[in-house]
């Protein structure tokens, strides 16, 4: 599989520890900034703004479902999946909701693939990053959802043998 071929090619694919998240998230920021800058609705933010946003993620992330790929010590790609908390993260933090958050983090039914980015130089690395996520979700008897993947992109094939259902969505705009 592609995962092994990238490891054989000298890539290190790992999950960061919680204490490494601040540094790792800044590396993700740099790569994300470069990769997404040509997206139509992209808006640049500072690394400080990004850190404030992503620092909060450390409390709800299952770091085993975050994959970082390094080539010669430089971040080449990342995949961030998290348990599907639904609207729970937006609700008031009562003791009951806090217990539900911890339960969902520990025993999720579904994982959401939130962010995926790969340096253009390393095409195919995204599939290598997705593979252990889908395998781990399968082992935990959970599903993994890659949200809003465009049909004409290569990402629709990631971990194809592990994919189950596929749903099609339309995105429409109405000028008023």
Enumerate the predicted regions with their spans:
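A generic structural signal for short coil/turn motifs at secondary-structure boundaries
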Residues: 40, 121-123
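A short, polar/charged loop/turn motif at coil->beta-strand junctions and beta-hairpin connectors
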Residues: 7-8, 107, 166
